[in-house]
Amino acid sequence: MKTLKYAWRFLMRSKSYTIINLLGLAFSLACSIILMRYIHRELTVDTHCIDREHVYAICTNTEGNRGLSGLKQYNYDTISIDNRFVEAMTTYIPLEKDYVISGTNRIPARCLVTDSVFFQLFHYPIVQGKLSLTTPQSALLTEKYARKIFGNENPIGKVLRYSNGKDITVEGIVGEPECKTTINFDIILSSKLSQHWERMNTELYRFLPGTDINAINKTGSVPRYINDPKYDTRTHTFSLISVKDIYWDGSLTDREPAMFLSGNHSHLIILSGVCLLLLLTGILNFINLYLVALLRRGKEYGLKKVFGVCGKTLFANIWIENTLLVLSALLVSWLIIEIMSAPTEYLFDIHFSYTAFDGWLSASILLLLPVITSIYPYIKYNYTSPILSIRSIGVQSHSKHFRMFFLGAQYIITFLLVVLSLYFNRQLGMLLNTEPGFRTKNIMNVNLVYESKDFSSYTYESMQQRRQRVMQLDNELNACPFIELYEPSNENILTPTFGTNYLNNKGEKVFLNIHYATPAFFKLYDIKVIEGEIPDINKENRRTVFVVNKAALKALGYTSINGAGVIEENQKRANANTSLQPIVAVVEDYFEGHLTSGIKPTIYPVGARFSGDLYQIAYTPGKKKEVIDFLRNLEYKVYGSEDFEYTFLEDDIKAMYTQDRQTATIYSIFAGMAIIISSLGLLGISLFDIRQRYREIAIRKVNGASAKDLYRLLFRKYITVLIIAFVIAIPLAYYLINTYTQDFAVRAPVSIDIFIISLLLVIIISLGTLAYQIQKAAYINPTQIMKTE
């Protein structure tokens, strides 16, 4: 208790250093804790799974096209997993653009079709009702979706009309797990509701202990035919992928972005690096300022050692003082986190709730940080000669060197973060301002067709009715004066597409992405034809012609379309006499997705019309409101509901760069925090250093030194430290930038102005911190100082 009081008394005597030290550490801890909470949330995705490392999905690879699927839907030359090794097995089907009808309202829904075994593998909290799918009509709603439909009414037992025309009954309301989840849905439907859904299912397995997963993967690596090779020679392989790994492989789920989240290891490494650098900045600042405060007690420690104080007592004093400071800083940091919770959640696009991890993290900081920060001061004073401690209070040259070393290390980190911040903001600007190579203005992606996802619900009559509704949509769109062009499809120009191998006239194999289109597609997006001509194809003429982009023409080994042709490898294997189909036109390259992914060699099978629920619509500039009103009325006329989903292409493109924007913003914010923390450290050190030099300054003034001379003298040491830190930070920043962006097809240049701006920014802010103290020192009264020193 006596030691605690002694420690508290010392901290109160050194109020300036205590406050500066506390604020610097609090800012550092607040930033680091925010980042660590986000990183922890990313690393614990899908922990609601009973065992995410040992629950596996089937990942199929069909000639270069990977995706999650199942084995039971392959009916030819396939293999099944031996049920003797299976502890539990379930399937799910994601239906991203589905809907239900409540009264007269059509409400978009992300539906997950599965069975009750799914809940044996994934634990969801039950808010109301029961967590089961006992009947084909059973349905479970998320708490948020139930509130959207029913408000404050009790939803249990309510009946909704599903898109296939069948009634479903709400039997339970599920809450959100504490962890982040890969699969996100609004409604869970029973797989018994239909036997023929719109898309294939994905199988999930939990195996019995001792099952050889490698042996199963080895068996799956053998190519097998999908269908009868007389007609279709495509093959597929399969492997098992754990639930834990699915999140980190976005290519498996990128066609349903509204239902599946994916992670980015590179992004997480960046955040981890920023977190580590900020924490290190705070710790260095803390140790440095604490050492400055201890320098005033060198004589005191020397006398204590003369009178027999042992090393344990000395360490206890230092450790308790650091613990009090760390505890205070930790409390302030959590206060900052709470105050900044709204902007933090906006920045990271997630809701942070308090979990056990927060408690463990705080306890770890409180236990470890005081020990870490006490080691160097303890070694310094425990092994310093008592005589040396008594004779000198902070005048040793090595003490000054260590202070400058710690300060320089802080500024190396600060310069590094500032340079990275400037670069990634420039990279973001380039991504947002670089034209993708196609028209982006005044184009909408609209879901106009709302039909059943249950294929078993269709009869001949219902199919005819569906065709009539789609024809009505097309006729009305053709008659609208505000609509220039439209293209029905299953995906828009940004949607990831599949591909396959094609052969050129030399029999060489080339993998090309496939994008089905009509002649209107190229006009709608203003994609320039650079060679040949895309013919007008009417509905009666069902032929398909091939168009390629420049990248595909080059990949195929052609320089012109003269004599150029392709054939799908699958077709050639099925019939060796199949001839090449000519390439009729070449179009300009464009970026189909994120600019950093580059331009993909693409082939366009061009036909009269391709069906799909998604309409890409180019409208007259300035007529956005009129077009939306027209489409709303059209939906009501065709489907009896004004509800429909739409986005604007410009917004979709901006959304692609959400993570890039987040990275740039994080660097900017935390680089600013690093400057503040380092400036606080500089302020604390200068308070001590400049005060120690008052006698020297007084003598220089007596000998005729001007204020300009004193400014130069006092600034010089700190300027030198900043310049050295900057010189060291330049190659580090350059290396990190080049390492991270080496695979980017489009990246901003690393120009010298980024480094110059960072140098000026840090120097101006940091030395501005010193201005008042140096001005005060330059105008001291020499007589008064000589009397008091």
Feature-to-residue mapping (PLM):
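Alpha-helical transmembrane segments
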Residues: 27-56, 340-347, 413-442, 740-745
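Membrane-proximal extracellular/periplasmic loop immediately following the first transmembrane helix
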Residues: 35-98, 199-206, 217-221, 239-249, ...
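Membrane-helix entry/capping segments
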Residues: 2-4, 9, 13-14, 223-275, ...
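Intracellular coupling helices
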Residues: 4-20, 24, 284-325, 383-393, ...
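Hydrophobic alpha-helical bundles that form the membrane domains of multi-pass transporters
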Residues: 260-341, 345-346, 360
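Mid-to-C-terminal secondary-structure elements
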Residues: 115-127, 139-263, 475-655
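Hydrophobic alpha-helical transmembrane segments of multi-pass inner-membrane transport and secretion
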Residues: 13-40, 262-299, 327, 402-427, ...
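Small-residue-rich transmembrane alpha-helices
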Residues: 30, 34, 288, 322-386, ...
